[in-house]
Amino acid sequence: MLKLRLKRCGRKQQAVYRIVAIDVRSRREGRDLRKVGFYDPIKNQTCLNVPAILYFLEKGAQPTRTVYDILRKAEFFKEKESTLS
């Protein structure tokens, strides 16, 4: 099963996260299938690869709670609903 989850990058005390598609059994820092976004909580920046995220969601990937909140805050699901209508 696939998950969309955060992978920690950056320096000490300056965490930056990549949003990645990864197998559930892998470690947090394990090898990811694909990088689908970027999140910087310090600068409050988010960058999303929408086609890649849609692809993995259609394949059955489940976002973690934090990734779901990031996607909702970026109004990702409003875009998805408008493309489905």
Swiss-Prot record:
One of its GO terms (biological process) is translation. Pfam families: Ribosomal_S16 (PF00886). GO terms for cellular component: chloroplast; small ribosomal subunit. Transmembrane segments: none annotated. Keywords: Chloroplast, Plastid, Ribonucleoprotein, Ribosomal protein. Its main location: plastid. It is found in: Plastid, Chloroplast. The keyword Chloroplast applies. InterPro entries: Ribosomal_bS16, Ribosomal_bS16_CS, Ribosomal_bS16_dom_sf. One of its GO terms (molecular function) is structural constituent of ribosome. The keyword Ribonucleoprotein applies. HAMAP family: Ribosomal_bS16. Belongs to the bacterial ribosomal protein bS16 family. This is Small ribosomal subunit protein bS16c. It comes from Triticum aestivum (Wheat). The gene is rps16.
